[in-house]
A protein has these predicted regions:
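PRPP-associated nucleotide enzymes
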Residues: 1-146
Length: 146
């Protein structure tokens, strides 16, 4: 497979395209999550363009490396309520909008891992509610789709 090299201007242009796309949808994330390693740079650029904070999440499936599970991100996405007074244990009004960014989407396995991880970490029995999270509260973006 031939490698394709991108200039800094190419990367900035692709990040601006992502920002323009979510602006057209009138959707604004509360924060951006960069998938380490390759997603950190575009996530940081996008977070600066949107003036929102940026977080990192380690998912390295390719090299049999360990992945980190960030339960608090799943709780943000779901609107989890850690209060016994709340019967439902989640509140859609508390959901944070999260843009997850990676550099390359080859097979979709990284994003599938993230979906499985977050759903298993936070109220996994609420599958219907989780289905409203993906694509609404949590959106995914990559610079390159193979």
């Amino acid at each position: 497979m031939n490698k394709i090299y991108y200039s800094w201007q190419d990367i900035e242009h692709q990040c601006q395209s992502i920002v323009n796309s979510i602006a057209r949808e009138q959707w604004r994330p509360d924060y951006v999550v960069g998938i380490t390693r390759g997603g950190n740079i575009p996530a940081t650029i996008i977070s600066h363009m949107l003036n929102v904070r940026c977080e990192a999440l380690k998912i390295a499936l390719r090299d049999n490396a360990e992945c980190e599970s960030n339960c608090w991100m799943a709780e943000d996405a779901f609107g989890y309520v850690d209060d016994p007074e709340y019967q439902a244990r989640w509140d859609p009004d508390l959901r944070k909008k999260i843009l997850v960014v990676d550099d390359i989407n080859d097979t979709g396995e990284t994003l599938n891992w993230l979906i499985r991880d977050w759903q298993s970490a936070c109220l996994p029995q609420e599958e219907y509610a989780w289905n409203t999270v993906w694509g609404n509260t949590v959106k995914f973006a990559s610079l390159v789709d193979n």
